[in-house]
């Protein structure tokens, strides 16, 4: 598993290549001032952003669109037409976990249920899709486990992969 930790002037961004086509991000601002984070990702990925603590804002298209995500809420973003690189601002003492999954990988996980997933059904195929959602208790438990990650380094990749799959099945 490839892990990168990037200390920005304020805040920390950790990214983990969990599996082919799946990236897990942990954005943490434990400072007393607002922190900004950027992460390049192509348009072939679905973005799930979960605000665990505090509040955040995701800006796209040179700041023309912004999506606030407050504690215990999430946003799903998919735009097959335009690149959506991540440009996030986190308020002080905030934590956001993100799962970036390629559309190909997502389809392979849910091919039998594709018609039940609103943005994968035939009517929406190829269209952009944005959805905000309050986190339920089961999803919150999984996200808190992912944030804590108290497993041995040799098992870390397997643990994150299992948690991402669990998270996707609950979402």
Question: Where do the language-model regions lie?
Answer:
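N-terminal regulatory/effector-sensing and dimerization cores
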Residues: 3-117
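Residue-level detector of solvent-exposed, low-hydrophobicity positions
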Residues: 74, 85, 127, 165-166
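Amphipathic alpha-helical segments enriched in hydrophobic/aromatic residues interleaved with Lys/Arg
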Residues: 118-163
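Hydrophobic recognition helices of helix-based DNA-binding modules
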Residues: 167-171
